[in-house]
């Protein structure tokens, strides 16, 4: 286990904020984590980070930052049709996807190149191109921060919805994910109906590796590489509005894209709303709206978290003014 004081969080946030944690703790097993918690009633306030691809630090963190280095992948169940694989929370998400594809297992390929770690995938319910982590997750193994007890959550207990889970809501900050068990298919099954995957494949017969590479190309074309330009992926969630509000908006803006969701509600791409407000490529100080995807805010170099937040607020205000729609951050602001 590693414990550091006044530790730079630069490698732990893709926005590139050079902030410090008063204490930083990295553990590489459940036993190390529970051992640390047993001896440290002073663990609060605390924040658990993964790859930091969905975090915006606006100041130094005065408490304890925890990071999992729990690695490993273990097959825990298998039939002719599927395989259940239990993965350590500290594994890099895209390494897991690459591994699944190399093994010939179906289900994770549309989630290629999403930054971050496996533990966060189960908290955030990451998603792309018509697939969400919740579609693959069977169990989430956790440790309770207060009691140090282990608890396994079945998929249904995680209350998953679009970019939401019980770990972000009712149980926020209460449980640490240590392992996630995914069920992947052994028989060919692709989701190619979303976005331009089909077009990117160019009529070729889909294969696991082919779909993975198509998704990687699409993402690289639209989303900035955090190593080159600090960012947290989509800064806002796509708003979901009641049908009546959508109808009224569609009358005024007939070309507005939309996706119907449960309960007769409609999801509108926040990127389109922001784009229509004229923000694409605009900046305030060293914080900018990415020129190729308006949903992404970028650090042009040396921006503070507060500067990024100011830009985010200005963007959200103009969307509210023009469309009457509230957009909420997907990124966690600390
Ligand atoms: N659009 C614009 N202008 C823009 C951006 C988008 O007009 O600047 C329009 C597009 O033309 C399209 C629609 O908005 O009609 C949706 O855009 P896109 O397909 O790029 O997807 P998104 O809704 O912007 C979501 C996820 C992404 C995920 C993609 C693909 C959220 C908040 N974001 O983006 O996830 O990769 O779909 O499935 O749901 C992330 O969460 O960090 C992330 C990148």
Report residues per predicted region.
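Anion-binding (especially nucleotide phosphate/pyrophosphate-binding) glycine-rich loop
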Residues: 1-147
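Beta-rich strand-turn-strand
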Residues: 105, 305-308
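Phosphate/pyrophosphate- and phosphate-bearing ligand-binding catalytic cores of soluble enzymes
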Residues: 4-5, 10-14, 55, 150-306, ...
């Amino acid at each position: 286990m590693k414990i550091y004081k006044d530790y730079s969080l630069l490698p732990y946030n893709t926005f590139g904020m050079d902030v410090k944690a008063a204490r930083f703790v990295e553990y590489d097993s459940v036993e190390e984590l529970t051992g640390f918690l047993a001896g440290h009633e002073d663990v609060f306030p605390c924040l658990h980070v993964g790859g930091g691809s969905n975090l915006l630090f606006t100041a130094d963190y005065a408490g304890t930052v925890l990071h999992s280095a729990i690695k490993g992948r273990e097959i825990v169940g298998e039939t002719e049709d599927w395989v259940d694989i239990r993965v350590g929370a500290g594994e890099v998400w895209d390494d897991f996807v690459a591994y699944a594809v190399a093994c010939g297992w179906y289900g994770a390929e549309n989630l290629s190149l999403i930054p971050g770690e496996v533990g966060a995938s189960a908290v955030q319910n990451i998603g792309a191109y018509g697939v969400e982590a919740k579609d693959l997750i069977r169990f989430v193994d956790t440790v309770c921060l207060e009691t140090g007890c282990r608890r396994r959550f079945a998929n249904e207990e995680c209350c998953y919805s679009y970019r939401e889970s019980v770990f972000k809501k009712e149980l926020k900050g209460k449980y640490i994910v240590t392992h996630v068990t995914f069920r992947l298919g052994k028989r060919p099954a692709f989701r190619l109906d979303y976005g331009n995957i089909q077009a990117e494949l160019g009529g070729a017969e889909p294969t696991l590796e082919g779909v993975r590479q198509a998704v990687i190309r699409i993402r690289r074309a639209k989303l900035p590489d955090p190593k080159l330009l600090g960012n947290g992926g989509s800064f806002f969630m796509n708003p979901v509005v009641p049908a009546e509000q959508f109808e009224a908006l569609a009358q005024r803006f007939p070309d507005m894209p939309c996706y119907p969701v449960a309960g007769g509600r409609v999801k509108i791409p926040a990127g389109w709303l922001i784009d229509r407000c004229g923000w694409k490529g605009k900046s305030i100080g060293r914080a900018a709206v990415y020129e190729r995807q308006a949903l992404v805010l970028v650090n042009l170099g040396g921006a503070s978290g507060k500067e990024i937040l100011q830009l985010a607020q200005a963007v959200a205000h103009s969307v509210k003014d023009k469309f009457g729609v509230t957009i909420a951050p997907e990124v966690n602001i600390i």
